[in-house]
């Protein structure tokens, strides 16, 4: 259905439900504890993001770097081709500062708040001895969310909303990826044939299903991050291209401004000269 009729409607509905879910957790959970954690977590991230980015565990082998930093870097690098193209497509016509605000800053802050709300609530319940959230996470990460929601009122409703959100997040990501692959295979056309789009969506789902059935979630994750390393070199080239593109755009805008200022200056000089000539003619007459 495309961006306007399909992805946009589904994404907006997804965001609304996620927002309601977040507010639900903040209000019914330990509100003050969540906001304190949000401030502290954000500050801790800003203080340590560079340090941990260069941390190689040379003196203490805990596998934390491999299981978190390296894994998620490779994970997001493998997602970057279609995510970047999709964001670029929906951001067409936006200013650079609007793009940075809407794609980097606001989503990052919302992510901090989301993790502080749900993670903070889980930690609070664990520390108060109400329930063993940590044990539930170690036993089965996929069901730990529902163990957390059971500690709050309307657990059946909130658990149902959680399942719906998981489905919507997956469908939104899959739909966006299929849309980008469809655009690439059609030579960059914005409106490719619907049948081709359906084919790529089904193919994407079939590949994911085969990997899940054949090797479980780990096989699917391995297949996703395998493309991370080779595409990292492509990203370096893309970063350089972006740098050159921004410089060329700046030079072009600077040239246009200089030409406009020059024309304005010349026009002002002509008006002054014409005014002086007119005054001289009046004096002579």
Label for each model-derived stretch:
Residues 124-128, 246-258:
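Short, Lys/Arg-enriched, Gly/Pro-containing loop segments at transmembrane-helix junctions
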Residues 25-34, 116, 206-215, 269-276:
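Hydrophobic alpha-helical transmembrane segments in multi-pass integral membrane proteins
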Residues 1-94, 101, 106-159, 167:
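Membrane-embedded translocation segments of transport machinery
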Residues 10, 104, 178-184:
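Re-entrant/interfacial helical elements at transmembrane boundaries that shape
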Residues 211-226:
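Extracellular/periplasmic helix-loop-helix junctions in multi-pass membrane proteins
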Residues 256-285:
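Long, low-complexity, intrinsically disordered cytosolic termini of multi-pass membrane proteins
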Residues 96-102, 187-200:
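Membrane-interface alpha-helices at helix entry/exit sites of multi-pass transporters
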Residues 18-29, 110-120, 161-179, 200-204, ...:
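Hydrophobic alpha-helical segments of multi-pass membrane transport proteins
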């Amino acid at each position: 259905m495309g961006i306007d009729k399909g992805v946009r409607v589904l994404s907006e509905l997804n965001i609304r439900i996620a927002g309601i879910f977040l507010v639900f957790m903040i209000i019914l959970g330990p509100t003050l504890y969540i906001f304190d954690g949000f401030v502290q977590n954000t500050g801790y991230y800003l203080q340590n993001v560079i340090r941990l980015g260069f941390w190689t565990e040379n003196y203490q082998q805990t596998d934390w770097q491999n299981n978190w930093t390296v894994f998620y870097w490779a994970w997001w690098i493998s997602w970057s081709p279609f995510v970047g193209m999709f964001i670029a497509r929906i951001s067409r016509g936006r200013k650079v500062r609007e793009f940075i605000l809407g794609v980097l800053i606001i989503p990052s802050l919302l992510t901090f708040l989301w993790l502080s709300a749900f993670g903070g609530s889980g930690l609070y319940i664990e520390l108060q001895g109400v329930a063993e959230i940590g044990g539930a996470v170690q036993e089965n990460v996929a069901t730990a969310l529902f163990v957390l929601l059971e500690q709050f009122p309307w657990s059946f409703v909130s658990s149902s909303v959680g399942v719906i959100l998981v489905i919507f997040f997956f469908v939104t990501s899959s739909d966006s990826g299929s849309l980008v692959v469809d655009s690439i295979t059609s030579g960059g056309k914005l409106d490719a044939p619907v049948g081709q789009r359906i084919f790529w969506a089904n193919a994407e789902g079939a590949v994911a299903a085969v990997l899940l059935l054949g090797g479980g979630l780990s096989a699917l994750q391995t297949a996703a991050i395998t493309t991370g390393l080779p595409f990292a070199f492509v990203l370096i080239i893309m970063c350089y291209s972006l740098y050159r593109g921004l410089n060329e755009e700046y030079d072009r805008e600077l040239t246009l401004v200089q030409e406009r200022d020059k024309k304005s200056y010349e026009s002002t000089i002509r008006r002054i000269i014409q005014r002086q000539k007119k005054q001289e003619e009046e004096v002579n007459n």
